[in-house]
Amino acid sequence: MDIDDIKHNRRVVSNISSLLDNDILCDVIITIGDGEEIKAHKTILAAGSKYFRTLFTTPMIIRDLVTRVNLQMFDKDAVKNIVQYLYNRHISSMNVIDVLKCADYLLIDDLVTDCESYVKDYTNHDTCIYIYHRLYEMSHIPIVKYVKRMVMRNIPTLITTDAFKNAVFEILLDIISTNDGEYVYREGYKVTILLKWLDYNYITEEQLLCILSCIDIQNLDKKSRLLLYSNTTINMYSSCVKFLLDNKQNRNIIPRQLCLVYHDTNYNISNPCILVYNINTMEYNTIYTIHNNIINYSSAVVDNEIIIAGGYNFNNISLNKVYKINIEHRTCVELPPMIKNRCHFSLAVIDDMIYAIGGQNGTIVERSVECYTMGDDTWKMLPDMPDAISSYGMCVFDQYIYIIGGRTEHVKYIPVQHMNEIVDINEHSSDKVIRYDTVNNIWEKLPNLCSGTIRPSVVSHKDDIYVVCDIKDDEINGFKTCIFRYNTKDNYKGWELITTIDSKLTVLHTILHDDAITILHWYESCMIQDKFNIDTYKWTNICYQRSNSYIVHDTLPIY
């Protein structure tokens, strides 16, 4: 006699289910929730759960006619769903995370796998930190590791979300203390994550000490140390303040200095060189040369490693390659290339993110913006600038990237020997000032400068932005170096001209050093170092000496 297997299976399931529904031969009572009870059959539960199988076959339990099991620590609807699942009934996916937790406890492997698959399909950028919040204690199951990796990869944007603001301390600790080589954050960015969380959460003294111990305080950059010292929550706890003071900054690893990215005009090729310049001793030496001839690239510092991107050479009018140079070990590796070819542009760095903005792409001036998070495989595009611009001034202040002046039309190839020569700054120059909000991904227009300027130097100090630029003066048939100041707390006040002096050169390199603007420039093979005190408005000539054949392209602060 042939029997329809499907019909037979359905009949068996129906018969077993009717025993459950009618409370026939039930020999186990499960207590859930606020004392509610579920009756079931040991044989059915043991067949689907290793936990129940082990429990019901122990010598002390096996003699019981009716066994009681307490599962009140789990969501009662999740327990009901699991019992239905063990009786081969359809269950709801509404509380899949609660079901996953209970199924993992009861060692129901098939159900755990099904729940993991559902959670993986549901997990994305917007939900990952919420799901990790619910599952972080279950680090032994694969889906939790998957969700954690997604959180770690997207933390630069997640720290602004409500899910992060509401995260428990254990998640914060997990993020900052991770030893996963792919997602270990630089020390300064750990401070950013911690302070953002502290803005919305209470933390005990013991917890805060635990977090601080995960940060290499000695090798923090100056800005991050000041942020820790000035934080209200940290200053509430004397032991935390003492911990910071006892771990004074280690100045011996990387001395206070500048890295100058320069070219040597004694050679026809244009290989970028990294030269370390000590501001205090005014001594310098070359530490690395990139074995690619490029000029008019952009450079930046990320966690005391130098990034060089884009530029052009004799064969290519623009490039998209990106290099990372380790200063301490004097090594160079190639990072993922930018999406767009760029030259005459700038790199902005906020935490672990690098922003490539505008610039020139062949004969086109770009409006495009792209960003790269250290450790990622690719760059991604961001909202365009309001106008296409290259050869502008740039600085980072809080969450904003400020763009000042620049050139609105493309410029032809300039030999490296002429990079520091005076250019006609009235030719297609811009007086516009804009800033990019990296949190909300929007561009904002600010008050314009009084005149167009190309390649101005920009630095920030306290709440002010300073622009050092050369303005053409027809009365003297030459140029004047002007310093403008803009207060970021008063967007309507505009730019204030605070000083002017005669200048011989339009290419200036500035750095804020000891509450003064230090200006480095090169003229006729001489290096000139001037200092402007922003409190007294006084100029001081520090150095005037031979600089061999160096043409400096950029200055990068190293602390």
UniProtKB/Swiss-Prot annotation:
One of its GO terms (biological process) is symbiont-mediated perturbation of host ubiquitin-like protein modification. SMART domains: BTB, Kelch. Keywords: Host cytoplasm, Host-virus interaction, Kelch repeat, Modulation of host E3 ubiquitin ligases by virus, Modulation of host ubiquitin pathway by virus, Repeat, Ubl conjugation pathway. It is found in: Host cytoplasm. Kelch repeats lie at residues 305-352, 353-399, 401-463. PROSITE patterns: BTB (PS50097). Residues 128-223 form the BACK domain. GO terms for cellular component: host cell cytoplasm. Residues 26-95 form the BTB domain. InterPro entries: BACK, BTB/POZ_dom, Kelch-typ_b-propeller, Kelch_1, SKP1/BTB/POZ_sf. Interacts (via BTB domain) with host CUL3. The BTB domain is responsible for the interaction with CUL3 while the Kelch repeat domains supposely serve to recruit the cellular substrates. Probable substrate-specific adapter of CUL3-containing E3 ubiquitin-protein ligases which mediate the ubiquitination and subsequent proteasomal degradation of host target proteins. This is Kelch repeat and BTB domain-containing protein 2. It comes from Ectromelia virus (strain Moscow).
